[in-house]
Structure formats: structure tokens, C-alpha cells
């Protein structure tokens, strides 16, 4: 498994959340569960590295190698 091949998008925002998507290489994408969204422990175990607080909130069914994450925007 090569975590170096994982692509992390820039963050994008709305009023409530910041978002990012993560694109996995095919060998790692095979390890993504098909029946549920992943917990932080699960996505870390397949090599995804990002700061704490990100939630795997949606699947993009046509492209299961793309993981969609969000986290609550905190007041400044």
C-alpha cells in the first residue's frame, strides 16, 4: 500500500463546514467498506492522513475511490 499515491484536495467551505475529498489508488480503494461510511480509525488504518475531526460523510457511488470528508467550521 502506498500512502504517497493518495491525493488530498484543497479544502473548500460553506457557512457550516469545511470539506475536502481524498482520491485513493485502486489497491487501497479495494479496502474501503461498501456497506458503511468509515470511522476515523478505519480511514487512518488504510493510510489516509489528515488532522483530527474530519468525518467521512458521503460516498460517491460512481467513483468509490473518492472519499468525501467534512468537519464543522469553528468560530474564529
From Swiss-Prot:
GO terms for biological process: cell division. One of its GO terms (molecular function) is cyclin-dependent protein serine/threonine kinase regulator activity. SMART domains: CKS. It holds the Pfam family CKS. SUPFAM superfamilies: Cell cycle regulatory proteins. PROSITE patterns: CKS_1, CKS_2. InterPro entries: Cyclin-dep_kinase_reg-sub, Cyclin-dep_kinase_reg-sub_sf. Keywords: Cell cycle, Cell division. It comes from the Eukaryota. Forms a homohexamer that can probably bind six kinase subunits. Binds to the catalytic subunit of the cyclin dependent kinases and is essential for their biological function. PANTHER family: CYCLIN-DEPENDENT KINASES REGULATORY SUBUNIT/60S RIBOSOME SUBUNIT BIOGENESIS PROTEIN NIP7. Belongs to the CKS family. This is Cyclin-dependent kinases regulatory subunit.
